[in-house]
């Protein structure tokens, strides 16, 4: 199943199809909008194939709220595995397992169902769109691990290197398709 993709070409496709939005969501921020990438058939295929390489060997893909749902489902379909949506707090009916993490101002929670799915002992790869500060990815890895999953790694489309998210998720191995 594993193919070897031209990483420079994958990175070029991502860079070409990423829209930059100045001063969003607040002044001074250069928002990276991946919507054009995901809406482009070739862009979605290139990203899905490359993330599927990263997730090869997993028997469950965990997609993070919200664009990670799209990517995770595409990767799981390519690999022939299931997908688990790791939701923001308050979106799932009880009972749930949750993990709280720090935001710049306050806290947030991620949740997964506590019933109906058994992730104990399963090899899980986490998929998301962007690695920024690493808080969400670290919380997801902690949550899944606390529920008995073997989190083998993570794959993201875009890494904002200056925000040092990779350090926040260490020792979890993260592979990024495009780093800026």
UniProtKB/Swiss-Prot annotation:
Gene3D superfamilies: 3.40.50.2020. GO terms for biological process: adenine salvage; AMP salvage; purine ribonucleoside salvage. It catalyses: AMP + diphosphate = 5-phospho-alpha-D-ribose 1-diphosphate + adenine. Pathway: Purine metabolism; AMP biosynthesis via salvage pathway; AMP from adenine: step 1/1. InterPro entries: Ade_phspho_trans, PRibTrfase_dom, PRTase-like, UPRTase/APRTase. Its EC number is 2.4.2.7. One of its GO terms (molecular function) is adenine phosphoribosyltransferase activity. GO terms for cellular component: cytoplasm. It is an enzyme of class 2 (transferase). Keywords: Cytoplasm, Glycosyltransferase, Purine salvage, Transferase. It is found in: Cytoplasm. Its main location: cytoplasm. Catalyzes a salvage reaction resulting in the formation of AMP, that is energically less costly than de novo synthesis. Homodimer. NCBIfam families: PRK02304.1-5. Belongs to the purine/pyrimidine phosphoribosyltransferase family. This is Adenine phosphoribosyltransferase. It comes from Mycolicibacterium smegmatis (strain ATCC 700084 / mc(2)155). The gene is apt.
């Amino acid at each position: 199943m594993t193919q070897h993709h031209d990483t420079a070409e994958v990175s070029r496709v991502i860079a070409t199809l990423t829209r930059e939005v100045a001063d969003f969501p607040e002044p001074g921020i250069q928002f990276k909008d991946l919507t054009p990438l995901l809406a482009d058939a070739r862009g979605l295929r290139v990203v899905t194939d490359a993330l599927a390489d990263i997730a090869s060997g997993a028997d469950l893909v965990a997609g993070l709220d919200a664009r990670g749902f799209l990517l995770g489902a595409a990767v799981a379909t390519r690999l022939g595995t299931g997908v688990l949506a790791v939701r923001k707090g308050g979106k799932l009916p009880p009972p749930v397992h949750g993990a709280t993490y720090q935001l710049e101002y306050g806290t947030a929670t991620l949740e997964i169902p506590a019933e109906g799915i058994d992730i104990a002992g399963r090899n899980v790869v986490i998929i998301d769109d962007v690695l920024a500060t690493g808080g969400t990815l670290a919380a997801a890895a902690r949550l899944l691990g606390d529920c008995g999953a073997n989190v083998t790694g993570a794959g993201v489309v875009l890494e904002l290197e200056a925000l040092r998210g990779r350090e926040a998720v260490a020792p979890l191995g993260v592979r990024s398709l495009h780093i800026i």
